[in-house]
Amino acid sequence: GLGDETPPDYLTSVSDGSFYGWPYCYWGKTVDDRVPQDPAMVARALTPDYALGGHTASLGLCWVPAGMLPGFDVDGMAIGQHGSWNRSTLSGYKVVFVPFANGRPAGPPRDILSGFLAPDESVSYGRPVGVVVGPDRKSLLVADDVGDVIWRVAGAR
């Protein structure tokens, strides 16, 4: 990698024919000089909409409608962050919520589910990967490929 925070995992809109930089550049037109360059491709590169942090391994995501979970009163994305292994201080190992407004990310992420990593980073109790809205439409189901379980996250009954 290029460092602990670079390049960040990201959330972005996708449109047919668009180019997001790989392998020539990242986060817009930031050139990666470790690879042979193609200036025409770098010029076409779009900047992603929202940074999720470096090496968080943000793998699974789903749309969460406003009010589905207590305290989350706007629409947004729930994102399973599988967690890093290749940085000096580990990151990820949780499920975050990114609020949306007008169809775009609009605010800092909030933790939905955390505690999968020991404070001293010596033990991973779980690594969230897949995230879906439960069949009851009032909960999230989170696949954990370390604990080999599916967590159900819902408000108090």
Where are these regions (language model features)?
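Blade-level signature of beta-propeller repeat domains, shared across WD40, Kelch, NHL, RCC1
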Residues: 132-157
